[in-house]
From Swiss-Prot:
Disulfide bonds: none annotated. InterPro entries: AAA+_ATPase, Archaeal_ATPase_domain, ATPase_dom, MJ1010-like_2nd, P-loop_NTPase, WH-like_DNA-bd_sf. PANTHER family: AAA+ ATPASE DOMAIN-CONTAINING PROTEIN (PTHR37096:SF1), YALI0E33429P (PTHR37096). It comes from Methanocaldococcus jannaschii (strain ATCC 43067 / DSM 2661 / JAL-1 / JCM 10045 / NBRC 100440). Keywords: ATP-binding, Nucleotide-binding, Plasmid. This is Uncharacterized ATP-binding protein MJECL26. GO terms for molecular function: ATP binding; ATP hydrolysis activity.
Length: 343
């Protein structure tokens, strides 16, 4: 799949993030959005497009780790070297850096203050060279359950460090990517971060964009009009294109996708201890509309069902705009089919 295709018309997002990286650091930026909406892809593109600028990117991708341990965190973030920062070997094609740490440094007896001192040293080394450091952490919520000696939560302490690096000292941008919206909810309500964070939504692809891509890929007007009622995520487009090459009709592909999501959702409901009726009641809010307002349409007793559906990535909760919707339009159709089958 060509580079150009993936980025078809993410201009608005690209421009926002590129500009953001070039402004003076003043807050932590949380980039959030439904699963697979293309957050990492856009971010990597930003890094690529700014590779000849005076920005040094520290980019850490935690999606590869189920639940990283303390040691994994240290090995991911630091590299033994006589330099204060060096190229990240895990991301060679991106040309991003990681923090350097002395050869004789003992990872086992590291306290959080040492960790933060090292991060500070690396960032200051970049600034002293007249360059701008930008720290990007993809799937930051994976660090949630890491504790250092004295039971200190790594994530909470990191937030304090990030506030200091951005809002207080204006040294370094910190950009955190996540599709875990309950995590964004926690952050949104976290007092440390109250006036120190901003949020940016990377949502479904716009319909006009999808139409242009499919047109360019040689789909007929009829196929495009059919597909537009169902597509919302970048990877769906590339799969649809591949399936067409393999001889599957647009309709067949989309029906298959809906069935897969429907079976997955049914299995989820059948295997949970939560009350089935409660779950179906919440799902039936989406029978005739694709999004609901958290304020106006959610009762307290429905919260546990909603939380369960959000945790399992059936629903997406846009905390900042106060709306809840399925994670994709395909998921919405799966929900509607399940609701209709119940009646």
């Amino acid at each position: 799949m060509g580079e150009i295709m993936k980025f078809y018309d993410r201009e608005k997002e690209l421009n926002y993030l590129k500009t953001y990286c070039q402004l003076e650091p003043n807050s932590i930026l949380f980039v959030y959005g439904p699963k697979s909406s293309g957050k990492s892809t856009v971010m990597r593109r930003v890094i690529k497009e700014l590779e000849n600028s005076n920005i040094v990117f520290f980019y850490y991708n935690l999606r590869k780790y189920a639940t990283p341990t303390r040691d994994e965190f240290l090995r991911v973030f630091f590299e033994k070297s006589d330099k204060k920062y060096l190229l990240n070997k895990l991301e060679l094609n991106l040309g991003v850096c990681k923090f350097g740490i002395e050869e004789n440094f003992d990872f086992n007896n590291l306290c959080l203050n040492d960790v933060f001192a090292k991060i500070n040293e690396s960032i200051n080394a970049v600034v002293e060279e007249g360059k701008k450091p930008v720290l990007i952490i993809d799937e930051l919520q994976k660090l949630k359950n890491i504790y250092f000696n004295g039971g200190k939560s790594l994530l909470n302490e990191l937030f304090n460090l990030f506030v200091s690096l951005t809002k207080m000292e204006h040294l370094c941008h910190v950009i955190c990517l996540t599709s875990d919206t309950l995590f964004i909810d926690e952050i949104y309500r976290n007092s440390t971060l109250k006036n120190a964070s901003e949020y940016y939504l990377i949502d479904w692809l716009r319909k006009g964009t999808i139409r242009n891509i499919l047109k360019e890929e040689g789909f007929s007007e009829e196929e495009i009009n059919y597909a537009l009622d169902y597509l919302s995520l970048p990877y769906e487009i590339s799969q649809l294109i591949n399936n067409k090459k393999l001889g599957l009709s647009v309709e067949q592909t989309i029906k298959q996708w809906i069935n897969v999501e429907k079976d997955g959702l049914k299995y989820l409901i059948d295997t949970t201890d939560l009350d089935e009726e409660g779950l179906y009641n919440v799902l039936s809010k989406f029978k005739d509309k694709i999004k609901i307002s958290y304020d106006k349409e959610v009762k307290k007793e429905e919260m546990k069902y909603l939380k369960f559906l959000i945790e399992n990535e059936i629903l997406f909760y846009d905390v900042i705009n106060g709306i809840i919707k399925p994670t994709s339009i395909i998921e919405w159709h799966a929900i509607k089919e399940i609701i209709n089958a119940m009646q």
